């Protein structure tokens, strides 16, 4: 049984790579006009929260049959957390595989926002393009969810954390002691482990509320992570990517230990395909951030996998935190759109692949 399961998943790698190659050729040619029209001598202009909000509303008005836009919550400073859904029946929760893409948990990491927005435009503008039938096929068979800016306050302030006031590491002090929580350390898995293994997980570094990795007084203490939690609990999806920058590598659970998940083989299969498309290094088992950096406690990936069973990845895009070259940014967007299309197609078989993997 295990041999048969392994063969099925290895076949998924080969098939996935073929899909990726087929998608990439028309995709790159379809947007070549966009890239050539950019003035490469001028720095790339990243979308602010207000610019993103305006563009999302404009796209929703123009493509209302394929795109819905809703706020899943408010930040401490009152900004909406926008969620985009793409589907051929966008107002209906269908029994179709879902995928989720998120960006900007860290407010000073902006390329992921551009990747998500570019993908939204690409899907909408090419939905009726007869030379790109895979776009219509994906819209017909997949429910695509995007939260392109998880941390609007942090993006606006250009800071890693959000902007909520802290009252000491446990939230007990009467006065404000610092500002901001690292949202990708605020999920409830395995948030409390640092207290059991303080040296392994560098508790003295992550406990002070002024630390750039401060994880909040308790799990899901922040408006932003609460919103993601409530949204994901109400929707089904098989695969997710959370974008960060930078490093050009791919990470998957477990994020805090070298111990493998029950779906290690499937995580590797999908991850290897992502790597084939974008050329990034897939961190597996002992390549992980353990024990060199103590691992990542409270990440969205761990929580999404444990709570939803989703194959949840972090993709660290690019080799600089905020590239200024328009060509570099467009290349990131182009490549990751190909990744997105592959994942939407692979999502069609993920549950059956899981069943095959766990046959006894």
Model-identified regions with their sequence ranges:
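C-terminal accessory segments enriched in acidic
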Residues: 41-45, 197-360
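Extracytoplasmic/secreted envelope proteins and their assembly/folding machinery
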Residues: 49, 53-56, 60, 116-120, ...
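Surface-exposed patches in mature extracellular/periplasmic domains of secreted proteins
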Residues: 66-73, 129-136, 283-288
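Conserved phosphate/anionic-ligand binding catalytic regions in large, soluble enzymes, centered on
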Residues: 106
């Amino acid at each position: 049984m295990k041999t048969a399961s392994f063969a099925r998943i290895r076949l998924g790698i080969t098939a996935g790579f073929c899909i990726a190659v087929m998608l990439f050729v028309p995709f790159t040619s379809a947007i070549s006009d966009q890239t050539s029209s950019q003035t490469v001598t001028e720095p790339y202009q990243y979308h602010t929260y207000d610019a993103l909000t305006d563009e999302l509303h404009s796209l929703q008005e123009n493509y209302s049959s394929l795109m819905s836009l809703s706020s899943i919550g408010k930040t401490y400073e009152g900004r909406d957390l926008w969620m985009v859904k793409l589907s051929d029946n966008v107002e209906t929760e269908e029994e179709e595989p879902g995928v989720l893409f998120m960006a900007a948990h860290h407010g000073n990491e902006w390329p992921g926002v551009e990747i998500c927005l570019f993908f939204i435009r690409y899907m909408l503008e090419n939905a009726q393009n007869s030379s790109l039938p895979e776009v219509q096929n994906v819209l017909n068979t997949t429910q695509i969810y995007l939260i392109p800016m998880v941390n609007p306050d942090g993006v606006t302030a250009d800071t890693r954390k959000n902007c909520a006031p802290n009252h000491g590491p446990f939230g007990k002090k009467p006065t404000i002691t610092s500002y901001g929580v690292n949202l990708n350390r605020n999920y409830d898995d395995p948030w409390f482990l640092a207290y059991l293994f303080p040296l392994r997980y560098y508790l003295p570094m992550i406990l002070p509320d002024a630390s750039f990795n401060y994880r909040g007084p308790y799990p899901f203490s922040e408006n932003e992570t609460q919103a993601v939690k409530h949204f994901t609990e109400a929707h089904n999806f098989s695969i997710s990517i959370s974008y960060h920058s930078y490093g050009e590598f791919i990470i998957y659970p477990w994020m805090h230990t070298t111990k493998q998940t029950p779906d290690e083989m499937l995580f590797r299969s999908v991850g290897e395909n992502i790597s084939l498309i974008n050329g990034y290094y897939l961190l597996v088992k002992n390549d992980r951030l353990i024990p060199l950096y103590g691992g990542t406690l409270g990440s969205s990936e761990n929580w999404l996998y444990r709570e939803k069973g989703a194959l949840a990845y972090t993709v660290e895009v690019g080799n600089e935190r905020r590239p200024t070259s328009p060509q570099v940014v467009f290349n990131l967007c182009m490549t990751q759109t190909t990744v997105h299309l592959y994942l939407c197609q692979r999502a069609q078989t993920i549950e059956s692949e899981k069943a095959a993997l766990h046959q006894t």
